[in-house]
Design a protein with these regions (language model features):
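Hydrophobic cores of alpha-helical transmembrane segments in multi-pass integral membrane proteins
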Residues: 1-16, 22-95, 105-137, 156-190, ...
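Short, membrane-exposed interhelical loops at transmembrane-helix boundaries
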Residues: 98-101, 335-337
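Membrane-interfacial, low-structure loops and terminal tails that flank and connect transmembrane helices
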Residues: 139-155
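Non-cytosolic membrane-interface motifs at loop->transmembrane helix junctions
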Residues: 266-277, 337-343
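Histidine/acidic residue-rich metal-binding segments in metalloenzymes
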Residues: 297-303
Length: 349
């Protein structure tokens, strides 16, 4: 259904619905984008939760709680967009949600933030529970693969444990930022002045992290499952540990490439954002892509629908990642910002 909403938007842009109000496009855009990201995240979390049962014991009760909370959040999101024409886009940049200008009613904005609050609470609890389950068997240093970095023998840590731990630690930081954003929106509704640039920075910090860790959790599943089809192990080693250790740091700063148009930002932040975006592509993407190619090369690969989709997913990640690195260049972004290049670079994911 969400994919069909994307098709509807392309038809609308082509002039297929000349009599339709423009507000419908933006309401559908909001539902499509948030719905897609949410679906990917929930799917990735459910997938790693299942695979982690081989090594740990995440709580089934927490998973059921998240199932119910996610459904409630989705219902509210559908109501405020298709029912209330709430149309700020997935980024809901301050102060747009507070000024419907007659396009959407206050109840739609309220429902939107209630939906975000419910989803944020549920997903944070889910994230913390998985980290708890990992911590019951692995110490933090072991789960992050630090023993591989120093050459110290220890408990063998599967890549799915390492990547999930890195992703969810960063995810907690993103959810904290989301809580702050929602709280500041509430404060502004009560008349308290807030800094627009701070609001935008927190919003993109949260959004960029959520989208990235969603992909990383998918990659973690590929690390775990693709070897079953290749007949070869894919173990954690020093290179893998170094790569994902770098991700833990760099991902916190790569979101700056969303803020290049904000001339009020200090120049050093813009430069640091470009450098971080470049460097992030190496550990997360290059190591995993070359690892996939090395695993498949000269192996007795069983090419089924599942293994083919795993492989194509990694290739699509690489294609979209190259386009993302190009767009994270300040001079290029100056021309490509707010063009079709932006959605084109992340749809291959």
């Amino acid at each position: 259904m969400l994919a069909l909403l994307g098709y509807f938007m392309r038809l609308y842009q082509s002039g297929a619905f000349p009599g339709m109000r423009a507000e419908w496009f933006y309401a559908v855009l909001t539902l499509h984008s948030l719905g897609m990201v949410g679906t990917w995240f929930v799917g990735s979390m459910a997938g790693v939760s299942y695979l982690l049962l081989r090594y740990t014991r995440p709580s089934l009760a927490v998973s059921k709680f998240n199932y119910g909370g996610t459904l409630l959040g989705i219902v509210l999101l559908i109501a405020c967009t298709l029912g209330g024409l709430f149309g700020t886009g997935w980024y809901f940049l301050y102060p747009l949600p507070l000024y419907g200008q007659g396009v959407w009613a206050p109840w739609a904005s309220f429902s939107f933030f209630v939906a975000l609050t419910i989803l944020g609470i549920c997903w944070t609890i889910w994230t913390l529970d998985i980290l708890r389950a990992i911590a019951q068997r692995y110490s933090l240093s072991a789960a992050l693969g630090w023993n591989y970095l120093i050459g110290k023998p220890g408990l063998q840590v599967p890549p799915v444990i390492l990547i999930t731990t890195v992703s969810l630690i960063v995810g907690v930081a993103g959810f904290v930022a989301a809580v702050i954003v929602i709280a500041l929106f509430g404060a502004r509704a009560l008349g308290v002045n807030v800094d627009p640039l701070l609001m935008k920075s927190l919003t993109f910090f949260f959004g960029h992290i959520l989208v990235n860790i969603t992909m990383y959790l998918g990659v973690a599943m590929v690390y775990e499952l693709l070897p079953l089809y290749a007949g070869r192990p894919w173990r954690t080693n020093r290179v893998v540990a170094m790569a994902w250790g770098a991700v833990l740091f760099l991902i916190l700063f790569a979101y700056f490439h969303h803020l290049y148009m904000d001339f009020a930002q200090p120049t050093w932040i813009q430069k640091f954002g470009q450098i971080s975006s470049y460097l992030l592509s190496v550990p997360a993407g290059v190591v995993s892509i070359f690892g996939t190619l090395a695993l498949v090369f000269a192996s007795k690969m069983r090419w089924t629908l599942a293994s083919t989709l795993f492989f194509l997913g990694i290739i699509g990640w690489g294609i979209g990642g190259i386009a993302a690195v190009i767009d994270s260049t300040v001079e290029v972004n100056f021309h490509y910002h707010n063009t079709q290049w932006v959605p084109a670079h992340f749809h291959p994911y």
